[in-house]
Amino acid sequence: MNVAHSLSEKPVILCLHFSGGTWQAWHGIFPHFSADYSVIAPDMRGHGKSEKPESGYHIEEMADDIILLLNELGIECCHIIGSSMGAEVGLSIAASHPEMVQSLVCEGGLYDRWGEYSLLEGTKEEAEIERTELLASIYNEKELVYSSAEEYLSSMKGEFKEAKIWNRHTETFIRSTMEQKVNGHFANRFTKNVLAGFISSCWDIRLEDYYCKISCPVLFLPSQEESENRLAEKSIQHFSSLIREHYITYIPDSLHAYVWLQFPFQAADAVISFYKSFKSGRLSS
């Protein structure tokens, strides 16, 4: 497993990136934690420079990878910050190994993929149609290949500028997603097989089954869109009722998964305020 870390005697923060991400998704927030914390940021299974097996993309399998990594590094306990998929993996770790997790930040893991606590309104049969169509669209999507690194970066820059999240942190992240093929062309390291494997493995997961097993404080960090969605609000309220200590906040104009690149100072500040709140006993519950 490819991993970046700066270990010392300081408390440890483990950063778990979103689907399609790399450890460089956290590039913007590292400086905000370096004074008081050690930071570990791996490329999770199927991502970045880590191995890309054909299977094993259930959140519990990816959680097992991370637990092995922590054991190898001699980390007995840590704070976890998870983004989208990474939040679900972090949640799985907190549920199966509560003694290892001091706190959990969930910028993701806020709702199921279908069912009562999801953003899909409809029957199980309609949800299955949604899943089938989603997987078909992934498998049918043509891989984008570029003749040069500059062409790859230019294309990605256009997409990120359109989303209004282009900055030096996103540029560093985008460079980390690029790899050169045997034929000399450039493409994204993240493959559709990995994405489809993750969606297939995790479609029926009920996140409430994990939340009810954790014992650490949780910060829910929905995006602006999620904070304004009544179904997301319903789900977050239900999940928060299953845990002993929680806090809910959001950053204005934030985008799901990309807030750490988009507003690194505000995102890091939200996490640090959360840490101070539960240490002083002022955490909402």
Region spans (language model):
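Catalytic histidine-centered segment of alpha/beta-hydrolase-like enzymes
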Residues: 254-264
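Conserved hydrolase catalytic core segment
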Residues: 76-120
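Active-site loop/turn elements of alpha/beta-hydrolase fold enzymes
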Residues: 44, 109, 223
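Active-site loop/oxyanion-hole signature of alpha/beta-hydrolase fold enzymes
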Residues: 10, 40-85, 96, 265, ...
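Conserved loop-alpha-helix segment in the C-terminal half of the alpha/beta-hydrolase fold
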Residues: 213-254
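Alpha/beta-hydrolase
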Residues: 145-226
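Conserved HGGG/HGGXW glycine-rich cap/lid loop of the alpha/beta-hydrolase fold
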Residues: 5-55, 275
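Flexible "cap/lid" loop of the alpha/beta hydrolase fold
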Residues: 104-147
